[in-house]
């Protein structure tokens, strides 16, 4: 997300389960053991580099902060995940981990929608591209069509018609 700093308001391991608090509560109380287990699982699965689960998220690198935000949502039972500029401002290693998480979600039968301004990323990660301009759909392109290329996607983004 573009505003990952704002989305990390909780300072400890609770942050990793924030989007699914019902799944980690026992009546009105949080199940700290389950939260800790989920935190350990996320740190391991997402390869989050942190000295402890209680580390202030803002002290982590940008890539690790991004993985915490993603981990929060992976803990939900959602079928659709929207990634808005998921790799902006993070290093190559963290990008690879984010891509892996997205691919794992797809393999698990989840729908992943990625919004990105990085065209190579879109071409590498997408099976289907919808190009929008000014709130209007300019093109709807499947990977197996001849229009699934940088030139045609940019043409549509600038308002041009595809043949």
Cite the ranges covered by each PLM segment:
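Amphipathic alpha-helical interaction/coupling elements
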Residues: 5, 15, 38, 152-157
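Single conserved hydrophobic/aromatic residue that forms the stacking wall/gate
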Residues: 1-6, 10
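A short, hydrophobic secondary-structure junction motif
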Residues: 40, 162-163
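Helical hairpin unit composed of two closely spaced alpha helices linked by a short loop
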Residues: 12-138
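Short alpha-helical
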Residues: 1, 120, 148
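Conserved beta-strand-loop-alpha-helix hinge in the C-terminal portion
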Residues: 25-26, 136-162
């Amino acid at each position: 997300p573009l505003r990952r700093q704002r989305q990390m308001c909780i300072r400890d391991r609770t942050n990793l389960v924030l989007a699914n608090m019902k799944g980690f509560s026992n009546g009105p109380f949080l199940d700290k053991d389950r939260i800790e287990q989920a935190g350990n699982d996320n740190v391991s699965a997402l390869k989050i580099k942190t000295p402890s689960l209680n580390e202030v998220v803002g002290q982590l690198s940008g890539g690790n902060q991004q993985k915490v935000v993603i981990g929060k949502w992976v803990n939900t039972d959602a079928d659709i995940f929207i990634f808005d500029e998921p790799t902006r401002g993070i290093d190559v290693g963290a990008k690879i981990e984010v891509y892996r998480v997205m691919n794992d979600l797809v393999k698990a039968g989840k729908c992943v929608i990625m919004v990105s301004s990085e065209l190579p990323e879109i071409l590498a990660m997408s099976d289907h591209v919808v190009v929008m301009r000014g709130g209007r759909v300019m093109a709807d392109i499947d990977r197996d069509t001849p229009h699934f290329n940088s030139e045609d996607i940019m043409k549509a983004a600038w308002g041009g018609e595809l043949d």
